[in-house]
Curated annotation (Swiss-Prot):
This is NAD(P)H-quinone oxidoreductase subunit H. One of its GO terms (biological process) is photosynthesis, light reaction. Its EC number is 7.1.1.-. The lineage of its organism: Bacteria, Bacillati, Cyanobacteriota, Cyanophyceae, Synechococcales. SUPFAM superfamilies: HydB/Nqo4-like. Signal peptide: none annotated. The gene is ndhH. One of its GO terms (cellular component) is plasma membrane-derived thylakoid membrane. Belongs to the complex I 49 kDa subunit family. Keywords: Membrane, NAD, NADP, Plastoquinone, Quinone, Thylakoid, Translocase, Transport. The keyword Transport applies.
Amino acid sequence: MAQLETRTEPMVVNFGPHHPSMHGVLRLVVTLDGEDVVDCEPVIGYLHRGMEKIAENRTNVMFVPYVSRMDYAAGMFYEAIVVNAPERLANIKVPKRASYIRAIMLELNRIANHLLWLGPFLADVGAQTPFFYIFREREMIYDLWEAATGQRLINNNYFRIGGVACDLPWGWLEKCKDFCDWFGPKIDEYEKLITNNPIFRRRIEGLGVIGKEQAINWSLSGPMLRAAGVPWDLRKVDHYECYDDFEWDIAWEKEGDCYARYRVRIEEMRQSLKILRQACEMIPGGPTENLEAQRTVEGKKGDLSGFDYQYVAKKVAPTFKIPNGELYTRLESGKGEIGVFIQGNNDVTPWRFKIRAADSNNLQILPHILKGAKVADIMAILGSIDVIMGSVDR
């Protein structure tokens, strides 16, 4: 009896750009052999707005409000890197108090970034409840930002060349300490719900494995790199702002899979709390209300009126000219290394302003770790990378 010969043809499927699990306007052209992924081609650019060219046609002071729109989950990080570049090029020194305020804002943003990653990632793999919990914690960070900057999520416009826009309001540091005390047990709550949940672990363990050498060769950074066994954190490596004053540990794992990336981000939130507590205690001058009272007693020529106790150095004029020269500066955001290459020509606008987005680099490895995976695992692997298409496309 003749037997029927069966043969399957590869099938091409489009994921996105309008798909509820795509984390933005990302399109994946996926080639499938049954349930297995044979190839994947990311199509980007749907959210391109020419941010680098905008930067080259604006003064640096004018460009700061733009950058938080690139990554709405990491607005403070982009504000920091955009002011750090001309500061280093022009050798502008930042007061110690301003540096501490910056570090506090950056660590709050790191926690907010990881929370906004955690909720949708868990929803992608089928755990809906924690998605609603994360907004409870983010709301408290929004309140702290609103009290200090006037804005809650994006367009904080708080960082300035030479420092920050204004000092912390009265009672703000105490509220920040209260948040740290309140948020610590919430991380424990997440871990009880998620970390050792057998369904969650079976769903993501062993998915999207990235080796140590592979992570380095693909220029990955942030949790993607540290989850692959490379304990590399720019806060330790580059010694920027005042991070050398704090005691904290680099969060890293060896497995390189989706579960390792989850563990790294959970531990990073704990380390951020440790940094926040130390910064609130060690900030030069202490709480604003105490600092102002002591200045009144000492007078204008007292020690607490010195440079390191100010929230900003000499305020930069709107006509501030970027000196001749070029440099690349970088910092560690919640997603990894973000950097700016700036080239000045003694003009109010930079001649070249190149932005390196962490999630843009991290996304490049997606086709390679998807090959051989099941179609149902695509969203889990993509979600573990943590991409925001505004900064990928710029």
